């Protein structure tokens, strides 16, 4: 895998940025996580994304406290809102032989 770009992550505030050109991405990469979110910290986050694929597949996923995986997007660009829940919350990407550019902002 080749990764060229930048990424930031702030688990305390559940924010992240990912701006990279990748080649041969296989597997999963967690962008931001909070393993013990309290009920009063649960809020809606907005994820903006742009995905330009040269080859393979890439998905943005949300993993909820009950470890249910939800695909938020697989291609193109746009934004999606996610309601965080008490417990463990994860936002990540999964790739299958993915090559292309990925831009993601979680706020």
Where are these regions (language model features)?
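Short, surface-exposed beta-strand/strand-loop-strand elements in extracellular ectodomains
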Residues: 54-72, 104
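Extracellular and analogous surface-interaction loops
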Residues: 31-45, 81-86
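A short beta-strand element within beta-rich, extracytoplasmic domains
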Residues: 43-53, 93
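Short, solvent-exposed loop/turn segments in extracellular or other extracytoplasmic domains
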Residues: 73-79
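A short tyrosine-centered beta-strand micro-motif
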Residues: 89-91
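Transition segment at domain starts
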Residues: 1-36
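Extracytosolic and intramembrane catalytic regions of membrane-associated proteins
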Residues: 59-61, 83, 94
């Amino acid at each position: 895998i080749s990764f060229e770009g930048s990424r930031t992550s702030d688990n305390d505030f559940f924010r992240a940025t990912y701006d990279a050109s990748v080649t041969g991405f296989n597997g999963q990469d967690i962008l931001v996580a909070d393993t013990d979110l309290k009920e009063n910290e649960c809020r809606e986050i907005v994820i903006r994304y742009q995905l330009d694929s040269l080859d393979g597949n890439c998905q943005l996923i949300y993993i909820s406290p009950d470890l249910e995986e939800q695909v938020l997007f697989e291609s193109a660009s746009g934004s999606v809102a996610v309601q965080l829940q008490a417990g463990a919350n994860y936002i990540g990407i999964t790739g299958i032989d993915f090559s292309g550019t990925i831009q993601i902002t979680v706020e």
